[in-house]
Swiss-Prot record:
Cellular component terms per the entry's GO annotation: cytosol
Role noted for this protein: Catalyzes the decarboxylation of S-adenosylmethionine to S-adenosylmethioninamine (dcAdoMet), the propylamine donor required for the synthesis of the polyamines spermine and spermidine from the diamine putrescine.
HAMAP family named among the record's database cross-references: AdoMetDC_2
Pathway membership, UniProt: Amine and polyamine biosynthesis; S-adenosylmethioninamine biosynthesis; S-adenosylmethioninamine from S-adenosyl-L-methionine: step 1/1
Cofactor comment: Binds 1 pyruvoyl group covalently per subunit.
Recorded name of the encoding gene: speD
Any single Pfam family the record assigns to this protein: AdoMet_dc
GO MF term set: adenosylmethionine decarboxylase activity
Modification Pyruvic acid (Ser), positions: 112
Active site residues per record: 112, 117, 140
Glycosyltransferase keyword on record: no
Protein name in the entry: S-adenosylmethionine decarboxylase proenzyme
Reactions it catalyzes: S-adenosyl-L-methionine + H(+) = S-adenosyl 3-(methylsulfanyl)propylamine + CO2
Amino acid sequence: MKKLKLHGFNNLTKSLSFCIYDICYAKTAEERDGYIAYIDELYNANRLTEILTETCSIIGANILNIARQDYEPQGASVTILVSEEPVDPQLIDKTEHPGPLPETVVAHLDKSHICVHTYPESHPEGGLCTFRADIEVSTCGVISPLKALNYLIHQLESDIVTIDYRVRGFTRDVNGMKHFIDHEINSIQNFMSDDIKSLYDMMDVNVYQENIFHTKMLLKEFDLKHYMFHTRPEELTEEERKVITDQLWKEMREIYYGRNIPSV
C-alpha cells in the first residue's frame, strides 16, 4: 500500500481483542479447587501487569496510568492507558508480517488502552475446568496493535485462541480524501510467526469491506498428561483415559466452534 501523506493526526482506531482458553481435567472437587487457585495465582494482577507493560514496550507506547485488581473468589483485571510521542509516520513499517516477541518496535500511540480480564471456571460435575482471559489492545495512531500479537500468544500459552481485529473511523490525506484503513491486511495469520502457526489449526472469517478480521486457533497436538491436574494418566485405567480424553476434546471443539456438540 502506498504511504499516505496525512492532514493532521492519524484518526484511525485499531482494536485487537482476543480470548485465550486453558483447559484442564481435575478428578476430584479438591483438585478442581486446587486448579482454580493455581491458575488464579499464575495469572494474578501483578503478572498480568508485567505482561501488558512488556506489550507497551513492544509497540513503543508510553504508560500514563495502570489500574489493576484481583477479585474474590477469583479473577483479575488490569487496564493501562498509554500515550504517543511525536513520530514520523513514514518510518513506520506497515507491511504484513509477524511482530516481534520481546524486541522493541519504534511506534507510539495516543488515546489508547490495553486491558485484560480473567475468568477461571469449573463445573461441579464432570471434572472439566477452563480458564479464559480476554485481552484488548486499542490504539489511535500510525501502528496496528497486531505487532503485539506474537508476544501475547507466546506469553499466554493456550489451547484455544479467538482473535478479532478491526479498524474504525477514517483519516484524511492532504488532498482531503478519506482513508478508512492505512495498512495492508488480508489475514491476522500473516502477523504470526511460523512457530505459532505450526502449533495450531486455524480458520479465518473476514469481512474485508468492513475492515473486520477474525481468526480462530485450536492446538493441534493433544497429550492427556498436559491436561491432568495432580493426576498422571498412567494412574488411570485405559477406559478412564478414553472417557477423559473424549470429554476434553469435546470441550475444546465446542469452545473453538462456539456451539454445543451433541454427545454420540
